[in-house]
Amino acid sequence: DSASVMLLKKVDSCGARFPIEFDFSSVRELDWFGGNAAISHWFDAYTLLVPENEAFYIRTLRNLVSSASPDEKRLLRIFFGQEARHGEAHRLYAHKMNEMGLATAPFVELANGIFYGALEPIQPIGLRMATVAAIEHVNASMAHIVLSKDMFRNAHSDVRRLFYWHFAEEIEHKCVAHDFLVRDRPSYFWFFTRYRG
């Protein structure tokens, strides 16, 4: 079975899923990662990129819904739901960062302007699909490292909960974009021509 099929089976066995609620009111220090400011800020920057990144993944894979089988459509719905919740949770934490005095808007506006204002509109869907599949595997690889080593064990418990939950779901759906990407056995030429426009 592919990882995508296993995800369907896991969701079926667990029944309905409910969004996890987060409260970051007790986070009061910017060096929440066990006093390590550098790592804290690295993951803070990651958080700032998550909401629009997740929206990009959803926009990209929505192009596949009309040609998907019933099982594939269910898989896409699961993927969309998980990614949307990731964006909402990280947006909530980003708001907390602003409350603590971090000026996040210039960074977010610059990154989103480059990636989604300038680059996304000129990229064919095949290239966007390849980008999503690649980033999802990077996320899953990072998630395996973080979770297997319990890297956030000394971090603030509420921030740790956010990232461990997010990373667990990244591992869970890491092959969704990849499985759709290779469905038609694409070549490099395909990336620049498929679903162009």
Q: Which residues does each predicted region cover?
A:
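Non-heme di-metal
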Residues: S4-G197
